[in-house]
Amino acid sequence: MEELKALRLKEKILEIELNSVKMQIHAYEESLKATTVNSVQEGEILQTESIPECPAQGKETPNPVKADSLLKTILGNERQNPLEGKSSKLVNLTPKSDKDKVKSSPVANGSGKDSTNPLNPVALGKSKMTILGQKQADEEEFKPDYLRAASNGQSWFAVYKGPNKEFFTEWEIVADICKKRQKSKRFRSKEQAEVSISLYNKDIQDPVNFLRPVKLVKEERAAQPLKFKAIAAEQTIQFDEFRQIWEKSRLSDLEDGVQEKFYTNDSASKSTYTFVENAEPYLVHTAFRAGLAKVIYPSPNLQELKWFPEGIVKAIKNFRKKVLNAKDAAIFIKIFSSIPDWVQSTRYEPYHFIQIGIAKTKKELPSSKVCKEEFSVQSLNKVRVQSLQTISQKLQEINEESSIKVNYCSSTCIMVSKFQKKTSTEDLKLVGIFESNLVNIEQLACGDQTKKEWCRIVRRTYQKHLCLYCKDKADSSSTSGEQNNVEKSCPDSPLTNAYDERSDDHKRIPSI
């Protein structure tokens, strides 16, 4: 319904313009007809008046309407003679002979080219001016209103927005309004300004309703990153998926590595992945969640890290921006990870210690060899404890004398890089918090079997360590008569001390 009203309004506007054009054409035709008729009638009248009467033979009288006589009377006493080049005084207006009479007669000189011919443009100037004036009057009579306003120099200014939303005829008022960042438009008639304002208000109040729903491509593209973020937020891995990625690392050969842009670092206990540019992002992220990713050489656009947590990707981008040599150079991401753990339906994330820096040369794909598959729950517990010990050793290397900067830190991941200055106090606090999460067995995200094995290793490194697993072992030893052996294993931690009284023997970690 709204579209029909708009079309009818446009139809009325076009009809008005068509009528104005027709009126112009009619005015021009009428003026041309009037010009032609008046010119013919005026010429006949002048020709009739300029022909002298033929007197009877022997009765020649001077004709006062003669062109020569009339012209001499108007011009005055002197006239330049073109034949003699001298001025002669006019004494008598009467021609001296028939010879002069014939020369001055318009009948004898019918061509109308003689200077004394009354049909000369000089003589017809007055009548022509009268005809032109009549033509202009006819045109003004049939001219539309907006053309009359244009000829008079009148303008209408339309203001579309603001409190002064109307049309004006004075530019001074419109100029003051335009200083307030309001737009205006100039028209030659009031009708055009009114139509323009009405159409503008209609477009604002009634938005365009398309016959078919328009599907925007940008909405579909904007939905994809949200989908990626939701999936990437799931950092845990199922046991079946872990077993597949574990077997892939042990059984992959050179052909698989070249095709999928990775190679494996094989040892007796496990195999880890090293990914190069253009590796499959999902495979890289799966290996990271499984704790089997060792080194990543990402592309300049970091497409391999598309499924990683947002905080890790943002920290790597900031590192490339702030480090001058890393803007265009290749970088490496070296990862020390533990193995995830599963207890019935509960899944625990692995711990990660990440180092980033500038890669010296591009990595070539070395040959990967097929290893013997050794997959069991007991072997996984052993590998998990060894990987936690490796992360703990990397954290102990950071102290006040080292030049390390912490780029990212969370409950299960810490990212560091080399720095030109000494490690700051804030970074040391972050390292201490992350290390306390590993040492505090009660807060460690893993199963009981892993906690018991990890407690045994922590007691070797931190002499003042005391946890519930230490107390359980001490209680069982006291009942069996092995109190002395328990005291040797924990010489600085008496069994009477509560768990709250434990303190880390790590001087470089500030108090938190």
Curated annotation (Swiss-Prot):
Locations listed in the record: Host cytoplasm
Protein name: Transactivator/viroplasmin protein
Ranges annotated as biased composition (Polar residues): 476-487
Keyword Metal-binding: no
Region (Disordered): 76-123, 474-512
Primary location class: host cell
Similarity comment: family membership: Belongs to the caulimoviridae viroplasmin family.
Additional detail: The inclusion bodies are the site of viral DNA synthesis, virion assembly and accumulation in the infected cell.
Compositionally skewed regions (Basic and acidic residues) per UniProt: 499-512
N-terminal signal peptide: none
Keyword list, A-Z: Host cytoplasm, Translation regulation
GO CC terms: host cell cytoplasm
Reported function: Enhances the translation of downstream ORFs on polycistronic mRNAs derived from figwort mosaic virus.
GO biological process terms, semicolon-separated: regulation of translation
Lineage: Viruses, Riboviria, Pararnavirae, Artverviricota, Revtraviricetes
